[in-house]
Amino acid sequence: MRHSKSGRKLNRTASHRKAMFANMAISLIEHEQIVTTLPKAKEIRPIVERLVTLGKRGGLHARRQAIASLRDAGKVAKLFDTLAPRYASRNGGYLRIMKAGFRTGDNAPMAVIEFVDRDVDAKGAVDRVRTESSANEKEASS
C-alpha cells in the first residue's frame, strides 16, 4: 500500500528523477521561467523554493548545500547574489505555476513555472517564443 508516500515517480528511477529536477532547477534559475508538464512543475516548485530559502540564508554551509543539489556553481552564484536579495522580504511563495494548455502529440497538460517578481529582461521560454513569433509576423506583413 502507498500510504503517506509523498511525491510523484514520473515513470523514472530515483537517480533519473534527481538529475531531471536538478537540470530543471538550473534552467529555471537561469531563465527565470520554463515550460514543462504540469506534474513536473508541481514537483519542482518545492525544490526551487527550498533553494531560494538557502540563498536567503546566505552562509557558506547554505551555499555548499545548494551546490550539492544543483551541481552548477555559476547558477548558485546567481541564486545567492541576484534572486535571494530580490525575495528577502517575501516569506515563501517565490514561484508561480500557470496552466498552458495541452501538448500536441500526447495531450499532456503543460504549465509555465516562473519566479513571481521575475526580471523580464531574463527572457524565459514563453517570452522567447512570443518575441520570435511577433518578429516573424512583422517580417511577413512587410
UniProtKB/Swiss-Prot annotation:
Keywords: Ribonucleoprotein, Ribosomal protein. One of its GO terms (biological process) is translation. One of its GO terms (cellular component) is cytosolic large ribosomal subunit. PROSITE patterns: RIBOSOMAL_L17. One of its GO terms (molecular function) is structural constituent of ribosome. Coiled coil: none annotated. NCBIfam families: L17 (TIGR00059). Belongs to the bacterial ribosomal protein bL17 family. This is Large ribosomal subunit protein bL17. It comes from Bartonella henselae (strain ATCC 49882 / DSM 28221 / CCUG 30454 / Houston 1) (Rochalimaea henselae). The gene is rplQ.
